[in-house]
From Swiss-Prot:
NADPH binds at M44, V45, D69, I70, A91, Y92, T93, Y157, K161. One of its GO terms (cellular component) is cytosol. It comes from Mycolicibacterium smegmatis (strain ATCC 700084 / mc(2)155). Pathway: Carbohydrate biosynthesis; dTDP-L-rhamnose biosynthesis. Binds 1 Mg(2+) ion per monomer. SUPFAM superfamilies: NAD(P)-binding Rossmann-fold domains (SSF51735). The record marks T132 as: Could provide a fine-tuning to achieve optimal pKa matching between active site and substrate. This is dTDP-4-dehydrorhamnose reductase. It catalyses: dTDP-beta-L-rhamnose + NADP(+) = dTDP-4-dehydro-beta-L-rhamnose + NADPH + H(+). InterPro entries: dTDP_dehydrorham_reduct (IPR005913), NAD(P)-bd_dom_sf (IPR036291), RmlD-like-bd (IPR029903). Belongs to the dTDP-4-dehydrorhamnose reductase family. Residues 264-276 have a biased composition (Basic and acidic residues). Involved in the biosynthesis of the dTDP-L-rhamnose which is a component of the critical linker, D-N-acetylglucosamine-L-rhamnose disaccharide, which connects the galactan region of arabinogalactan to peptidoglycan via a phosphodiester linkage. Catalyzes the reduction of dTDP-6-deoxy-L-lyxo-4-hexulose to yield dTDP-L-rhamnose.
Length: 327
């Protein structure tokens, strides 16, 4: 297995580069070992994905956003050139800041994925693009969203991610668009579970919104779904990959306190108006995996079980030293 860091590489970065003009590229993701290009590999999902893909025997080129700016068409074509499959983890994820930087958010979340899709189509490489539950939310509902339900983002971040989905599928109809939600690792980063762990270690009560409901998703489980797609047997198109069940942020916070042995009664419910933000948040974006399962993607386990394992993994890792921070 090879894990190749993109830093300092040139167009000849593969350990076993393909000869110019060969015809062995594969858009179908049904072979055991693949050459995987990961964009946005410096982020929470990208880091775990790079490690797990290499552990499964794939040759991996892990590119941070500074090493491959997906808004740069030339850079994208250069790095995609010899890959069997590209997994796009690069995104503008600062939901509130996107309200003040809509052009930048659109460039990264819509133009960039379109560039990747066009480059992959040109060389017959597979493409897996990660999207979000925030493409939904404008409709008042309380039942999980299926892949073909009407979209309706309520903020600029969600609108740019929806535009990215459309750009990907327009340029490469056989791409995989994988929507996920409320992703966390729980270590030393700034995700919701990591934040709740830090607050649980302190004293006093905290107020957490109970009127935002979604699908908390553990990074490790999401990565498993992405690698299942690489392994083959999943139909292309839009898929949902989120841990099963329904949770509010309040529910997720209480469960995190319980998992670390803190008193969950310290977590108190409140409304979103208690914590006003520049970008509106959707009240309900639970993702259903039913159609995705029919397409061949194994549904992810219940969010509470995943959260317990995530916290246990963090505790085990910190016994020997802290986890790397995740931006």
């Amino acid at each position: 297995m090879d894990l190749i860091n993109g830093m300092g590489t040139s167009p000849g970065y593969w350990r076993t580069p393909r000869e110019p003009g060969n015809d062995h590229r594969r858009a179908r993701l049904d072979v055991m070992a693949q050459r995987i290009v990961i964009t946005g590999a410096g982020g929470m999902v990208g880091r775990v994905l790079a490690d797990q893909a290499a552990a499964k025997g794939h040759t991996v080129l892990a590119l941070t956003s500074s090493q491959c700016d997906i808004t740069d068409e030339d850079a994208v074509r250069r790095f995609v050139a010899n890959g069997d499959v590209v997994i796009n983890c690069a995104a503008y994820t600062q939901v509130d800041k996107a309200e003040d930087e809509p052009e930048r958010a659109h460039a990264v979340n819509a133009v960039g994925p379109g560039n990747l899709a066009k480059a992959c189509a040109a060389v017959d490489a597979g493409l897996i693009h990660i999207s979000t539950d925030y493409v939904f939310g404008a409709v008042d509902r309380d039942t999980p969203y299926e892949v073909d339900d009407e979209t309706g983002p309520v903020n600029i971040y969600g609108r740019t991610k929806l535009a990215g989905e459309q750009a990907v599928l327009a340029a490469k109809p056989d791409a995989y668009v994988v929507r996920t939600a409320w992703v966390y690792r729980g270590g030393d980063g700034s995700d919701f579970v990591a934040t709740m762990r830090r607050l649980a270690a302190g004293d006093g009560a905290i107020d957490v919104v109970a009127d935002q409901v979604g699908s908390p998703t553990y990074t490790g489980d999401l990565v498993g779904a992405l690698l299942q797609i690489v392994d083959g047997g999943v139909e292309p198109g839009i898929l949902h990959a989120a841990n099963a069940g329904v949770a509010s942020r309040f529910d997720q916070a209480r469960a995190t306190f319980e998992a670390v042995g803190a008193d969950p009664e310290r977590v108190r419910p409140c409304g979103s108006d208690r914590h006003p933000r520049p970008a509106p948040r959707p009240s309900y974006t639970v993702l259903s995996s039913q159609r995705s399962a029919q397409a061949g993607l194994t549904p992810l386990r219940d969010w509470r079980e995943a959260l317990q394992d995530a916290v246990a993994a963090v505790v085990g890792a910190t016994t020997d030293g802290p986890l790397p921070s995740t931006p």
